[in-house]
Amino acid sequence: MNALRLAVLAALWGALCACGPIKSTAFLLDAEVQIEAARTAGADKLSPYEWTAANLYIHKAREEVGYSDFEAGVEYAGKASKFANEARDKAMAVARGDPGAGVVTPPSP
């Protein structure tokens, strides 16, 4: 009975230890796909702020995962994905010629 309990605890511990690397890898892959979609839409030229932010965040995410700080890696990868989506959407709007696309309006006081 003790051996079974120990085996179950060891399996559970192993599964919990693997959650960080698996989750961070999934978030990194998603962000990389979003960045590639933004590149395809021409975001590097049509939406440079969001494009640059996405690339800097994915770089930082990879760095944090390299240091085994998976929580920070997931956070930065999520930000990279968010900025890549914004870059793609903005680039597509500019390419379509939507009025106001790419125009930044200051926040109201």
Language model regions located:
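Sec-dependent bacterial lipoprotein signal peptides
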Residues: 1-19
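Long, charged/polar, soluble alpha-helical segments
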Residues: 19-109
